[in-house]
Amino acid sequence: MSKPRATYKEAGVDIEAGNSFVQKIKPLVKSTFRPEVMTEIGGFGGLFSLNAAKYKNPVLVSGTDGVGTKLKLAFLADRHDTVGIDLVAMCVNDIVVQGAEPLFFLDYLATGKLDPDKAAQIVAGIAEGCRQAGCALIGGETAEMPGFYADGEYDIAGFTVGVVEKDQIIDGSSITVGNKLIGIGSSGLHSNGYSLARRIIFDRMGLAINSPLPDSTKTVDEELLTPTRIYVRSVMNLLKDFRINGIAHITGGGLLENVPRILPKGCSASFKLGSWDMPSIFTTLQEAGNVEQNEMYRTFNMGIGMVLAVAAADVDDILSRLNGLGEQAWLIGEVKSMSKNQTEQVVLV
C-alpha cells in the first residue's frame, strides 16, 4: 500500500492563492510607478533608475518601520484598507524630515494562511500611501507561514529609499536659540501608543470596536483606524522656498522623546500647551485612563505629527504656505538655551 503523497498545500502553503493574490495587486502596484521604474511586478528585484545627472551630490536615505499593535484594531474591525497607508507613512515621514524625497517603497506581509482578498486590501492601502508620498512600490514579499500567526492575523513591515542633495540634508545642526517651532497637525493617534489606547478603551471604558466614542462623532474603529497623515508633499513644497533648520517626526515617544533627536547640545524646546487644536481622542484617553501629562506626551503625538524649527522671520509665511497646502499648522514653541540645572530638553509650559 503506497503512502499518501505530501504536498506543500496540505502543509499549509497555498501557491495558487499566492498567484491569485499577485494578479489582484498588479494594477494597484502599477498605479504607483514613476518614470524611473524599470521592472514589472514579479521580478527577483525591483529596478529604479536614479538618473544621477539630475543631482550634484546625491545621498540616499533609507527608512524602515511597521504599524505595531494598530493592526489589532484592523483585525477586530475586519478592515484592512487603511493600515497600508499607515505603513507607508511611518517610513516616508521618517526620511522626509532629513530633506529626502522618497523614491521607492517595498513591503513585507506575513500571515499564517494567505487570504488573497484581504491581502489585496492591505496592498491597496500601501499603493494609496505610495501615491500620496509620490514614491513607487517596486517590490515586496508575502510570506505564508502556517502555525506562526493566529487565525486571521498578519504583520506588515515597510522599507523606503529616498534621495537628498548632500548640502541640503536636514539634521538639526543649524538649529539655534530663538528659532521658532511650528507644529503640523496629526490626523489622530497615527500609529503609536495603541497598546495603551486599547487598554484604556476596551478594558477601562468597556467599549466595543464599533461603539460611539464620547465627545466624538466617530466610532472606536473610525477614530483608531484613521490613517497616519503623510507629510511628504507639504514638506517638499516648503523646502523649495524656505530654510528649515530641523524637522522631527512625532512618533513613538511623542514630543518629549522625538524633538530632542534634532536639538543641538545646549538647546531645549519650550512648547506652549493650548497653542494648537488637539483632537478630542487624546483628552478622552487621558481622562478615562487617568494618565499623567508627561506620560501622554511621551506616548502619543497629542495632535502634532511634525515639528519644524525655523527662523522667526519665516513663521508667518510658512504657516500660510502650510495652510494653503491643506495642513493645520500652528506656532507652538521656541528653541531656548538649557539652563545650568536643566535636565530635560523639552519643556511644556
UniProtKB/Swiss-Prot annotation:
Major site of localization recorded for this protein: cytoplasm
Enzyme Commission numbers on file: 6.3.3.1
This protein's record includes keyword Kinase: no
Superkingdom of source: Bacteria
InterPro entries: PurM-like_C_dom, PurM-like_C_sf, PurM-like_N, PurM-like_N_sf, PurM_cligase
Catalytic activity entry: 2-formamido-N(1)-(5-O-phospho-beta-D-ribosyl)acetamidine + ATP = 5-amino-1-(5-phospho-beta-D-ribosyl)imidazole + ADP + phosphate + H(+)
Compartments, as annotated in UniProt: Cytoplasm
Pathway field: Purine metabolism; IMP biosynthesis via de novo pathway; 5-amino-1-(5-phospho-D-ribosyl)imidazole from N(2)-formyl-N(1)-(5-phospho-D-ribosyl)glycinamide: step 2/2
Entry's Gene Ontology cellular component terms: cytosol
Keywords annotated in UniProt: ATP-binding, Cytoplasm, Ligase, Nucleotide-binding, Purine biosynthesis
Family: Belongs to the AIR synthase family.
Protein name as catalogued: Phosphoribosylformylglycinamidine cyclo-ligase
Organism, as annotated: Trichlorobacter lovleyi (strain ATCC BAA-1151 / DSM 17278 / SZ) (Geobacter lovleyi)
Gene encoding the protein: purM
